[in-house]
Every structure is written in structure tokens, then in C-alpha cells.
Amino acid sequence: MTKNKPKVFLWSLVFSIGLMLAAGSCLADAIDNWIEQFSPSVLSKEDMRKELEWFAKAAEPYKGMAIKTCAENIQTHTYESEVLAKAFTELTGINVNHDIIGEGDVVERLQTQMATNKIIYHAYVNDGDMKGTHLRKKSAVVLSDYMKNEGKNITSPYLDYPGDFLNPEFGYDYEGNTLQIPDQQFPILYWFRYDLFTDPKYMKMFKEKYGYELGVPVTWAAYEDIAEFWTKHVKQIDGKPIWGHLDYGKKGPWLGWRFSDAWFSLAGMGSKGLPNGLPVDEWGIRVENGIPVGATMARGGQLDSPAAIYGLTFFLDMLKKYAPPYAMGLQWSEVGPIPGKGEIAQTIYYCGTFSSFPDYSTPNSPVTDEKGLPKWRMAPQPYGKYWEPGMKVGYQDAGSWTIPTNVTGKERDAAWLFAQFAISKTVSLKKFLVGRTPNRKSVVFHPMWNAETMKPYGGLIEFFRSNERKLFTDTGLNVPDYPLLQEQWWQYISMAATGEKTPAEAMKALAEKEDQLMSRLRLPYLSPKIGEPKGEKYWMGQPGGLKPEIKDRGKAITINYDEMLKRWSQNELR
């Protein structure tokens, strides 16, 4: 028997070498395949190979593990679930189940995990709106610390964070630590029919009636004039109705998002400051040294201020006067495709992701030409009469990678590897082409983009390239418990929509409810301390304080769309 031992050893060695060579060959083939799948990329094919090889090597200690992650139901995340999770598993041997669920379900499951300490998912693509909650509840891994310490060896040298990211500040705490990293982002913008706005017939009609040029509205006063023009004066085009406004007003949680997603910042509520107003943010919450002290005017907040009441009143007036009659019965999930049907001239509320609906790019649709190029454009939303330079303007949704603190050890590491893969330079451009929600500068400044290749996107890429994007930010850090406070919004705002309360009554009741709820919170860090009411007159004179009521509607200002793009190219604002 002993004579055969060298032969057995030799055959075992040959067999082992064969397995290793086969495995190496399989990995090389997989990398070759995915390089083709992920092209075009911001990286050269050589650099794509280096990045993918790094993931394969870094994941070796975790091979055979299984992790679960989740994200909300938009096209970008569906691509991650169907394509990126598969690629990551092939390349690393880590099995990933990337669940696609409703936006509310993402928050609900994350809340449950935080409350019960039971792992439901190892990582979430959770809106950056939650960062104030994560900060105070210490519920998310501080990724900037993790990358420097325990996660240092599995943090990709190719990540290029924060330098290459469009808005990394969407995941920062007050001191600049990273709680969440943007996976994708999309703005809420103004949408309009460029073909109609540049038609000499309508330009002449508008100028004669209103005394200024028809163009992209910069202010709410101009938006209102333009809404009236299409709905009340043009009325029909080619025998079909044309409406000067579209929005949604159905009672439900979506009506809360419509406002908590920075609508009141457009009205001009809050303090100056970027990415969010300090000491008062776009939720009307005042903080002192990071501690929330009130949302009511009497406590230095602004949620029941003249600017907030104006914001709600304007929303209701536009909806009732200038939108199609069915708009009051719409919810968020229904409104996106409607402008693509050809009967809407403009809308002040248009999510960038809506442009992925077929009618916005299908040849010869009501809003495209024979090549499928858009007759529509996107531009920044106009702002209201209380807005001042130095304030944020609108909203960007930033679905961001978030690792709960109860995910530890190897599971945390494996989740971090997949999160990095989903935002890697190798995949980011292809992911944008699918879902139109970028996260990197290298995506929107890629050499493939020129005047012709940007046309199908209707101004979206130009927006992300401009400095204007820095004024459109997500919910800030002042909100101490986002799920708890946000669910109040729709309940009170819907009372104004149905006529049960006036806008002033609804905003006063909402502000008082927010103060009441915040006063009950006992959080581990920077917990609210709701102060004694000092009265509105006191706060009028304080930094970042209240603005007195403005009686007039403000000045009507428009800008020529092409002139705006020219300004952007020169790093100017509109």
C-alpha cells in the first residue's frame, strides 16, 4: 500500500491543480461576460476587469454566504435585483437576494428591524430622508468610520467616494460623517411641452395677454399665469383639451410625501443653508445645536408660518383651477404617465423617473417625434414669493445604502461588498441608461454625452451637470423620527384638500401635532427638547426666523429654456 501513496498524492495534486485552473478559468469567463454586459461603462475594459477581479478576491472569505437586501420599486432597483445580484453572485460566490418592495414597506421593515433587533435584511436602499432618524437612534453603521477601520480591507480602492459622487452630502450627519451612501438619485422637476412653448402662435398670444415672454417659469406667479393661459385661454389643441397644470390630490400617504419632499422650501419656508436650512429646515423644524426644539411658530419653527400656509394654498388653487377634474382623485403612482398622453402643457411636479414610461420615448407618441425624441423638456421647479437666494429650492430623492447596526461581523462585510458593487464605476453608467437615476459625476460627464446623445433625456443630464442640482436636496437632519412624523402630514393636509379645514387651520394642527410627538421622543442622541412657546414676535427677530406675511403674489419671471442651458454650461444658475 505504501508504494501507491506517492501516486495517490500525485493524482490528488494534479486533480487539485485542475480544479483551481478550472475555477480560475470560470471566473475569467464570468468577468469577460459581465464586462460586455456592463458596457458602456465609465471605466475602460481593462479597468473594469481590475475592479471585478478585486471584488472576486475581496469576497473569498465570504464565499458561500447568503445575504438579503431590499429596495423600493423603481426600474433602477429592479435592474439591481435581476442583473447586478446575479453578477455579484457569479463573481464572488456570495448569494444575494435583493428584494424589490414598496417604498413604505422598506421603511416599515427597517423600523421593525430597529425595534426588534431581529435581522430582516442585511442592508437597505433607504432614502437619505432617514438620516436624522439614524443619527439620533444610532440605527445605521457609520460608514465613514467603518471604511477606515474594520471594513478597511474590504473597501474598494476603486470606490472613489466621496469625490465621484454627485451629492454625497445627502448621507452626512451634522459633522460630515457618512451614515448612508447614495445608490441612485432623482429630482422632482418642472416638465413642459417645449414644442408648444416655442410655437410662435402661442408665444404671441401669451405676450399680448400677460406682457412678458412665455418660457420656463422661475417663480410661482409666472407658473400660475402659464397655467391659466393653457387651461382658460388656449383650452384645446387639434380638438383635444390642453391643461396648464397637473398634480395629484387623493387622500393617502402619497399626499404627505408630496409636501414633506421639500414643497415648502419652494414656497420659501425655512432658513438659508445648504444642503438644508439651519436652524430651520424645509419641514419647519428648528434645531439648536442639533436638538429639535419645535415646529410651531411659537417655538421658533415654521410649519404653521405664512410661507407654509401659502405653499398649501397655492397647491390647492392650482389643482382646483387649472388641472383636469380627475387630478384630485389621483395618487402618486398614477400621475407619472399622464403628461405623456399629450394633454398636459406643464406640471410643477414631475419625478425624473417618470421619463422612463414608454410614451416619453416611443416614436410618434403624443409627446415625441418620429424618432422618439422628446417634444418635452425638464427644468428646475419654480419657487414662491418667500424664497430667497441662499435657500434650497426643491427635492432630490436619494435611495442610499444603509447597513443597520445589528448586522455585524461577516454579514456586515458581505452586505458592504454588495452595496459597493451596486454603486461601482463598472456598473453605474449602464444602471443609469436603464433607470435614469445617476449617482456619480463620471456618469453624467461621460464623453458619450453630447448635444445629440443627451436629447432623449429632455434636460435631465444637463440638470445633473449643473450647479442647480446642489439646490435640490433631500430631507435634512433636523427630522428626529422620519416615519413617525411623516405619517402625520397626509392626514392633516388631506383635511385642507377636502375643505374640512382651511390651509391655515391644517398647518397649525400639523405643527402642533409634530411638537406633541417630538416632545415624547426619548432618543439616544440629540433627542428633541421642545421648548416653551415664546410667541411669534420673539422669533421674528431671531436668526433664520420667521418671515412676515407677504400680501402680493410676487413677481412673474420666466426664462428661455435654451438660455438657461447656456447659463448652466457656464456654471451659472438660471
Regions found by a protein language model. Give the residues of each.
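Hinge/lid segment of periplasmic solute-binding proteins
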Residues: 30-61, 128-189, 373-381, 553-574
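Extracytoplasmic/periplasmic substrate-recognition and gating elements
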Residues: 176, 320-326, 344-346, 362-444, ...
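Long, aromatic- and glycine/proline-rich binding clefts that accommodate carbohydrate-like moieties
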Residues: 49-54, 66, 373-383, 395, ...
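Periplasmic solute-binding protein
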Residues: 128-148, 164-212, 224, 247-296, ...
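Extracytoplasmic "Venus flytrap"/periplasmic binding protein-like
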Residues: 29, 86-165, 200-201, 205-207, ...
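Short, polar/charged alpha-helical segment
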Residues: 51-58, 75-95, 191, 195, ...
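Extracytoplasmic "Venus flytrap"
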Residues: 44, 49-52, 64-83, 186
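Glycine-centered hinge/linker elements that transmit conformational signals in sensory
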Residues: 222-228, 266-329, 372, 377-382
